Amino acid sequence: MGYARKVGWVTAGLVIGAGACYCIYRLTRGRKQNKEKMAEGGSGDVDDAGDCSGARYNDWSDDDDDSNESKSIVWYPPWARIGTEAGTRARARARARATRARRAVQKRASPNSDDTVLSPQELQKVLCLVEMSEKPYILEAALIALGNNAAYAFNRDIIRDLGGLPIVAKILNTRDPIVKEKALIVLNNLSVNAENQRRLKVYMNQVCDDTITSRLNSSVQLAGLRLLTNMTVTNEYQHMLANSISDFFRLFSAGNEETKLQVLKLLLNLAENPAMTRELLRAQVPSSLGSLFNKKENKEVILKLLVIFENINDNFKWEENEPTQNQFGEGSLFFFLKEFQVCADKVLGIESHHDFLVKVKVGKFMAKLAEHMFPKSQE
C-alpha cells in the first residue's frame, strides 16, 4: 500500500512539472512571436497610447488585411534603436535579432520610398502617440515617422493643421537626448514652410538655449543648430538670436569640424542681413578665433569665415560710424577686425595655402578691409 502511494505521488509530481514547463514554454513562445511580429512591422501586445482613438499599435490601419496602407507604417521595436547613441539601449539577449530588425526598419524608413508617406488619418494616429506616450522608444519611432513625412511639402500643412507643431515642440522638454534630437529634426523639416516658421518662432529662445547648453558636438546640439539655421534663412526672426551670437562664436571655436560648419551657416545668414551687422560686431569672440587662420584648418571653414567677415565689412560703413565706435567693447568682433595688423598677420599666415581659391579669398578680404578701415591712409 505504501509503495502504491509513493508511485502516485511521483506520478502527480511529474504531471505538475510537465504542466509548469508547458506554461513557461507557451509564455516565452508568445513573447518571441510578439517580438517577431513587431520586427516585421506588425503589431504587438503593447498599449501605451492612452484613450486616444485608433492610437493602439495594432490598429494603425482601419483594415485588417495586409494592405499597402498598413505596410506604410514604420514600426521601431524597443531593441531596434536607430543611431549611434541608441546602441547603449540595445538588449544584449536580442543582439542578433536587433541587427536584422534595424536593417529592416532603416530600409522601410527611407525618405526615398513612397511607402513612408502616411495619410492624414495615419498622421493623426502618430501625433496621438507622440502626445500620449511616455516611453522613449515609442516616442522615437513616432517622431522618425513624422520626420520622414515632414520632408514632403504637402505634409507640412497637414501636420500643422492637425495641431502637430505644439505637440512635437512639447517633446523638447524631455531629458532623453535621442528623443529630443528626433523632435528637433521634425521641427527642422517643418520649418521650411513659411507659416510653420511663423508659429515656431515662439520656441526659438528655448531651442537656442538648449543648443548652447547641450553637450559640445552632440547630436542634439547639431540638430538645434540646423533648426536655427532654417529659421534664419529670412530676416524676419534673426533679431531673436542677437543675444546669443557670442555663444555661437564660442561654439565655433570649441567645436569639431561638423559643429564649426553648422555654426558658420547660421552666422552667414545673420551676416547677410545689414540690420544684424551691429549685433555681430558687438559679439564677444574668443581670443582663439584668430588661430583658426592656419594652413591646417579645413578649407571650407576658412572660406565661409572669410565670407562672413566680408559681408560684415561691406554692411558696416567704418567712416560713417566712427563716432559710435565706443559702443563696442573690448574683445568684440569689432575690435578683432579693427586691429588690422593683427588680423592681417593671421590671414597672411595662410597665403601660402596650396588652394588657389583660398589665396584669392584672402587677397579680396585684405583689400576690402584696408579700403574700408583706412581710406585716408591710402590717399
Swiss-Prot record:
<keyword id="KW-0539">Nucleus</keyword>
<feature type="compositionally biased region" description="Basic residues">
    <location>
        <begin position="95"/>
        <end position="106"/>
    </location>
</feature>
<feature type="modified residue" description="Phosphoserine">
    <location>
        <position position="61"/>
    </location>
</feature>
<comment type="subunit">
    <text>Interacts (via ARM domain) with MIRO1, MIRO2 and TRAK2. The interaction with Miro is calcium-dependent. Interacts with SOX10.</text>
</comment>
<dbReference type="GO" id="GO:0008104">
    <property type="term" value="P:protein localization"/>
</dbReference>
<feature type="repeat" description="ARM 1">
    <location>
        <begin position="111"/>
        <end position="151"/>
    </location>
</feature>
<keyword id="KW-1000">Mitochondrion outer membrane</keyword>
<keyword id="KW-0597">Phosphoprotein</keyword>
<feature type="repeat" description="ARM 3">
    <location>
        <begin position="233"/>
        <end position="272"/>
    </location>
</feature>
<feature type="modified residue" description="Phosphoserine">
    <location>
        <position position="110"/>
    </location>
</feature>
<feature type="topological domain" description="Mitochondrial intermembrane">
    <location>
        <begin position="1"/>
        <end position="6"/>
    </location>
</feature>
<comment type="similarity">
    <text>Belongs to the eutherian X-chromosome-specific Armcx family.</text>
</comment>
<dbReference type="GO" id="GO:0005741">
    <property type="term" value="C:mitochondrial outer membrane"/>
</dbReference>
<dbReference type="GO" id="GO:0007005">
    <property type="term" value="P:mitochondrion organization"/>
</dbReference>
<feature type="region of interest" description="Mitochondrion outer membrane (MOM)-targeting sequence">
    <location>
        <begin position="1"/>
        <end position="6"/>
    </location>
</feature>
<dbReference type="GO" id="GO:0045944">
    <property type="term" value="P:positive regulation of transcription by RNA polymerase II"/>
</dbReference>
<dbReference type="GO" id="GO:1904115">
    <property type="term" value="C:axon cytoplasm"/>
</dbReference>
<keyword id="KW-0472">Membrane</keyword>
<dbReference type="GO" id="GO:0005739">
    <property type="term" value="C:mitochondrion"/>
</dbReference>
<dbReference type="InterPro" id="IPR051303">
    <property type="entry name" value="Armcx_regulator"/>
</dbReference>
<dbReference type="GO" id="GO:0005829">
    <property type="term" value="C:cytosol"/>
</dbReference>
<feature type="region of interest" description="Mitochondrion outer membrane (MOM)-targeting sequence">
    <location>
        <begin position="26"/>
        <end position="37"/>
    </location>
</feature>
<dbReference type="InterPro" id="IPR011989">
    <property type="entry name" value="ARM-like"/>
</dbReference>
<feature type="transmembrane region" description="Helical; Signal-anchor">
    <location>
        <begin position="7"/>
        <end position="29"/>
    </location>
</feature>
<feature type="topological domain" description="Cytoplasmic">
    <location>
        <begin position="30"/>
        <end position="379"/>
    </location>
</feature>
<dbReference type="GO" id="GO:0005634">
    <property type="term" value="C:nucleus"/>
</dbReference>
<feature type="repeat" description="ARM 2">
    <location>
        <begin position="153"/>
        <end position="192"/>
    </location>
</feature>
<comment type="function">
    <text>Regulates mitochondrial aggregation and transport in axons in living neurons. May link mitochondria to the TRAK2-kinesin motor complex via its interaction with Miro and TRAK2. Mitochondrial distribution and dynamics is regulated through ARMCX3 protein degradation, which is promoted by PCK and negatively regulated by WNT1. Enhances the SOX10-mediated transactivation of the neuronal acetylcholine receptor subunit alpha-3 and beta-4 subunit gene promoters.</text>
</comment>
<feature type="region of interest" description="Nuclear localization signal">
    <location>
        <begin position="89"/>
        <end position="98"/>
    </location>
</feature>
<dbReference type="Pfam" id="PF04826">
    <property type="entry name" value="Arm_2"/>
</dbReference>
<feature type="modified residue" description="Phosphoserine">
    <location>
        <position position="67"/>
    </location>
</feature>
<feature type="modified residue" description="Phosphoserine">
    <location>
        <position position="72"/>
    </location>
</feature>
<keyword id="KW-1133">Transmembrane helix</keyword>
<protein>
    <recommendedName>
        <fullName>Armadillo repeat-containing X-linked protein 3</fullName>
    </recommendedName>
</protein>
<keyword id="KW-0677">Repeat</keyword>
<keyword id="KW-0496">Mitochondrion</keyword>
<keyword id="KW-0735">Signal-anchor</keyword>
<keyword id="KW-0812">Transmembrane</keyword>
<dbReference type="InterPro" id="IPR000225">
    <property type="entry name" value="Armadillo"/>
</dbReference>
<feature type="region of interest" description="Disordered">
    <location>
        <begin position="95"/>
        <end position="116"/>
    </location>
</feature>
<keyword id="KW-0963">Cytoplasm</keyword>
<dbReference type="GO" id="GO:0019896">
    <property type="term" value="P:axonal transport of mitochondrion"/>
</dbReference>
